[in-house]
Amino acid sequence: STLGTTILLSKIAKLFPPGVINVINGDEKIGMALNSASLVRSISFTGGGNVAKLIMKDAAKNLKRVQFELGGNDPAIILEDLDFDKYMNRIIDGTFTRAGQVCKATKRIYVPEHRADEFFEILYKRLNEFKIGYQLNPESNMGPINNKNQYNFIKSLGAGLIANNKNAYEVGQSIDDYWQ
């Protein structure tokens, strides 16, 4: 699901002689075939830890070089004296850049309890001003979700909060249900 990145990488690979760098997108079947092929000497994988363990185990049989970019779980820690108006855009960018689908995206925000209402009031206001659209359009704040699985995962996070009697706020506007 990192198709955009690999397309860009394939364009960069054209700067090298043919066969030096090969970029192939595919599902598990293609990935495992490449992983077990003796001609493949190096594997770069972006994804989750469970799949990375399988790749590493299989790659070890032929002592292949491996490089992983695994999903992060990064917090934003808000200090007592933070000027919310001044820094809220940085917090939002850290959370929603590429629709939040980057490994270093902020997954949770810790706010001093006595400032939580103030923080979330400003955050809620700014997020309601978001415009979802084509990511290269300067008027858009955020592009679309990368794939249906990610979309469903995000929806399940909100449902889980509600099921556990936590506060969940829906902000922004809905776009057509692309995945139906």
Language-model-detected regions and their locations in the chain:
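A structured beta-alpha segment of the ubiquitous adenosine-cofactor-binding alpha/beta core
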Residues: 6, 23-41
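Conserved small-residue-rich beta-alpha loop and adjacent elements
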Residues: 1-17, 63, 85
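ALDH superfamily catalytic-core signature
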Residues: 19, 42, 48-180
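N-terminal Rossmann NAD(P)-binding subdomain characteristic of aldehyde/semialdehyde dehydrogenases
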Residues: 14-25, 165
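Solvent-exposed polar/charged
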Residues: 14, 36, 57-61
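Short beta->alpha connector loops at strand-helix junctions that form conserved
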Residues: 1, 25, 46, 79-80
